[in-house]
Amino acid sequence: MAEEQAQPQLALERIYVKDMSLEVPGAGVFTKEWNPELDINLSSNAEKLDDDHYQVVLTVSVTAKNAEEAAFIAEVHQAGIFLLKDIPEDQIGQILGAYCPNVLFPYAREVISDIVTRGSFPQLLLAPVNFDQAFAQSQQQAQVDAEGNA
């Protein structure tokens, strides 16, 4: 009788805010008409905790300028502990680089919206992000860079 192949397991075991901040450099922004320019930056990082667990941290940073004056800088490090058991090695990068950030983003989006509103600014709803596409582009760029260095 052939040995049974272990079933791959993928699960989010814990989600938490690792760090968050809101900086409002000057109160003068509250006296001007609100027409902000937003600069949004996203990044993710994965760290292996043990054989089957990874911590993935999605960092979302939003800088708002109003009338050429810095209005606020909001940043959240949304983290999750993911179980990846018996996952084929060639799929782990895609899971950590695209799937996990897709899971974390709605939570990070909510935290950003909440801290911006608590800072007395209008609600900020970030548009959905296609992390699968971003991961594919970063893989293509890494391949181009590797070929250029060869």
UniProtKB/Swiss-Prot annotation:
One of its GO terms (biological process) is protein transport. It is found in: Cytoplasm. Its main location: cytoplasm. Keywords: Chaperone, Cytoplasm, Protein transport, Translocation, Transport. It comes from the Bacteria. Pfam families: SecB. Gene3D superfamilies: SecB-like (3.10.420.10). Homotetramer, a dimer of dimers. One homotetramer interacts with 1 SecA dimer. One of the proteins required for the normal export of preproteins out of the cell cytoplasm. It is a molecular chaperone that binds to a subset of precursor proteins, maintaining them in a translocation-competent state. It also specifically binds to its receptor SecA. NCBIfam families: PRK05751.1-4 (NF004393), secB (TIGR00809). Belongs to the SecB family. This is Protein-export protein SecB. The gene is secB.
